[in-house]
From Swiss-Prot:
Keyword entries, A-Z: Hydrolase, Virulence
Function (record text): Alpha/beta hydrolasee; part of the gene cluster that mediates the biosynthesis of pyrrocidines, fungal natural products containing a macrocyclic para-cyclophane connected to a decahydrofluorene ring system that show potent antibiotic activities toward Gram-negative bacteria. Within the pathway, pydG catalyzes the Knoevenagel condensation that affords the 3-pyrrolin-2-one ring, using as substrate the polyketide-tyrosyl acyl thioester product of pydA.
Family per similarity comment: Belongs to the AB hydrolase superfamily.
Keyword Hydrolase: yes
InterPro entries assigned: AB_hydrolase_fold, FrsA-like, FrsA_esterase
A GO molecular function held by the record: hydrolase activity
UniProt-listed Enzyme Commission number(s): 3.7.1.-
Name of this protein: Alpha/beta hydrolase pydG
The organism of origin for this protein: Acremonium sp
Superkingdom classification of source: Eukaryota
Cross-referenced Pfam families: FrsA-like
TM region(s), chain numbering: none
């Protein structure tokens, strides 16, 4: 398979970025210009290359806006936002450059949002302890409205995505098909993690309850939006796919789109680590100090591992690798002793996907997708679908990167079916 970089991680992220081109997140010429300046496993060259393109796209957007070119300005601002997002991507979250660059990504995106065909509402969802969850509610333009009220897709970020990046999948396509799409960041995501240091939480059903309550209140306070809170779907990819399944235990959620989820983060970790050594540590034969030293040394010698360890520690609110790995065990669909199985609580329609191109970076079809499908005992076979493509063009990579247009098509075909939406053939 062709690669853009000899670094597996860099190639994956470059494919992820280029894959947003169909929805306005990247330009091929800008992509080629940046890639030619990036050195293998060199985060500084990555950052310099993408910051150059971000600032360039921002200037183009400003020039187009000054000239009155609404469409061209919007497109340039979208690209600038996406390039600013990836500029600090290879840095650890404690790097002082990260937050200002993400804030620039947000600023560029908001400039694009006011130029979109449908209304975009910037929302702050009340969470807890005075914290709010930021998001964008993308509404269908008048020409794309369906008969009746507007169904809603709630789209949660994963471990490393942002609410701005989420636009390039469902935020772009959904409103054009008559859906309202809420792209949001929960605890441990976006600036809530990078700036406020709020970690991820495994029981995302608690977060989902806050989101549903917010939509109820918004629908009541703004009845002219005609939001259909009786037709709510929850979507997410990778870690977000796990979150979507936890959210689907809420009876208000009528459909779940779980893209390449993991069943157990700890088990996923074991599948990518020296399993025997991890088991010895987990059983107490290897002390924490030895394990932490080993992990830190390994991270310094392997860029991808070091990056993942840094992200994991910040996402889990852990100072040491041992604390991080222990917290991984909380992120599971396996029920605690004596509890009702989590997947038994799901009764809505479920669309499950898995990676199948031999590059299952952060999920496994066999250990996660198919296992979850088998354990959804209270969802009739007619209400659950599985899609595990093997070719990259079909969505074989993790989170379906490089094939988001096809993923969007399959997603909304599924939602149309279960939300009883009929469309005439063209």
């Amino acid at each position: 398979m062709f690669t853009f970089s000899s670094s597996f991680m860099f190639d994956f992220e470059l494919t992820r970025l280029l894959g947003s081109a169909s929805s306005g997140g990247c330009d091929v010429g800008e992509f080629k210009s940046a890639v030619g300046k990036i050195k293998k496993d060199d985060p500084e060259s990555w950052s310099v290359a993408w910051k150059e393109q971000a600032e360039r796209a921002q200037r183009i957007g400003d020039q187009a806006a000054k000239a009155g070119y609404r469409l061209l300005a919007r497109n340039a601002y979208l690209r600038a936002s996406n390039y600013f997002r990836v500029t600090p991507y290879m840095f650890s979250n404690d790097d002082a450059r990260v937050v200002p660059l993400i804030e620039q990504s947000i600023s560029s995106f908001k400039k694009a949002a006011v130029l979109m065909d449908g209304e975009v509402i910037c929302v702050e969802i009340p969470y807890e302890k005075g914290i709010t969850l930021p998001g964008y509610l993308f509404l269908p333009p008048s020409y794309a409205r369906l008969p009746g009220k507007v169904p809603i897709v709630m789209y949660a970020a994963g471990a490393d995505s942002t609410k701005e990046e989420l636009y390039f999948l469902y935020g772009h396509t959904g409103p054009q098909l008559g859906y309202a799409v809420l792209c949001l960041e929960g605890p441990g995501q976006g600036l809530l993690l990078k700036k406020s240091k709020v970690p991820l939480r495994p029981d995302f059903e608690v977060v989902a309850e806050k989101i549903v309550e917010f939509l109820d209140n918004l629908s009541e306070s703004r009845p002219t939006l005609e939001l259909d809170t009786g037709r709510l779907a929850m979507a997410g990819a990778a870690t977000g796919g796990y979150f979507a399944l936890r959210a689907a235990t809420n009876p208000r959620v009528k459909a779940c789109i779980s893209i390449d989820p993991f069943f157990s983060l700890w088990e996923l970790c074991l599948s990518r680590a020296p399993k025997a050594f991890f088991k010895l540590w987990d059983s107490g034969w290897v002390p924490d100090s030895t394990f932490d030293t080993f992990t830190d040394v390994h991270g310094r010698g392997n860029f991808q591992s070091g990056w993942e360890i840094n992200l994991g520690r910040s996402s889990m609110g852990a100072e040491k690798p041992t604390a991080m790995f222990r917290r991984f065990k909380d992120f599971t669909l396996e029920p605690a002793a004596g509890e009702v199985p989590i997947l038994d609580k799901i009764r809505c329609a479920v669309f499950l996907t898995g990676p199948g191109a031999g590059q299952d970076m952060y999920s496994s079809a066999e250990e996660s997708t198919f296992k979850i499908h088998r354990l959804l005992s209270n969802v009739p076979d007619s209400n659950k679908e599985v899609w595990v493509p093997t070719d990259v063009a079909e969505g074989g990579l993790t989170a379906k990167i490089g094939a988001w247009a096809l993923l969007a098509q399959k997603t909304f075909e599924f939602l149309d079916k279960h939300f009883d939406i009929k469309r005439p053939e063209l």
